[in-house]
């Protein structure tokens, strides 16, 4: 079992707590190192609940889950979301990275019933250009994603944070501008623009010359 790193919260005042309930990702996004090992390893749920309760008992302002795709396992996501709803202290906020198009009706119903500010969702879109999405091996149903984003907004209780990546294959200024306009039109609480990082060991790194990508040879490899 992984050691719990937050037994002593001294020094973490006004800082975000980063937390993992799983490792790995079942998807194959070509820019991501998690795509190399397609296995997802879930931590023991009783340990996860015990550690989350520690954060709740200490009124931690924010816990940021860094699971690559938090909702890739439906039962795992539902159990954690039910727990934090049932044990809500009225203070702590939980941040999750999710694939919006994978969210099921029962998940949407559950999160839609939560206290405003209990959770926030980061939704990776990266691009709306179909050729780019195919080339980076990303699985995404854009029409469904848009539906889910709007449904979440209708409850007015969850901060939505949508992501785009600039510099992806088959993306030029015109297609990126279209991606930006499409996502901006969804009116998320926050739209984050990141730049492609070509990480050693990734599919993107192995094929960078084919894409004619220019990037830094030192961190952050942008």
Residue ranges of model-derived segments:
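Radical SAM [4Fe-4S] cluster-binding motif and immediate context
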Residues: 2-154
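Conserved C-terminal portion of the radical SAM core fold
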Residues: 56-66, 91-97, 112-127, 139-221
């Amino acid at each position: 079992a992984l050691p719990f790193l937050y037994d002593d919260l001294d020094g973490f005042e006004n800082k975000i707590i980063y937390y993992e309930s799983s490792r790995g990702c079942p998807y194959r996004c070509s820019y991501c190192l998690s795509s190399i090992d397609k296995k997802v390893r879930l931590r023991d749920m009783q340990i996860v609940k015990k550690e989350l309760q520690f954060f709740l008992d200490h009124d931690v302002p924010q816990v940021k889950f860094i699971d690559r795709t938090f909702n890739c396992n439906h039962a795992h996501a539902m159990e954690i979301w039910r727990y934090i709803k049932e044990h809500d202290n009225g203070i702590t906020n939980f941040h999750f990275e999710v694939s919006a198009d994978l969210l099921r009706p029962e998940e949407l119903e559950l999160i839609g019933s939560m206290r405003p500010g209990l959770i926030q969702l980061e939704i990776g879109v990266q691009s709306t250009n179909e050729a780019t999405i195919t080339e980076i091996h990303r699985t995404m149903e854009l029409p469904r994603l848009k539906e889910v984003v709007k449904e979440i907004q209708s409850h007015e209780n969850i901060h939505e944070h949508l992501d785009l990546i600039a510099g992806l294959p088959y993306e030029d200024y015109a297609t990126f501008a279209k991606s930006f306009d499409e996502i901006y039109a969804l009116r998320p609480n926050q739209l984050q623009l990141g730049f492609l990082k070509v990480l050693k060991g990734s599919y993107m790194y192995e094929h960078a010359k084919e894409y004619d990508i220019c990037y830094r040879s030192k961190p952050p490899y942008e």
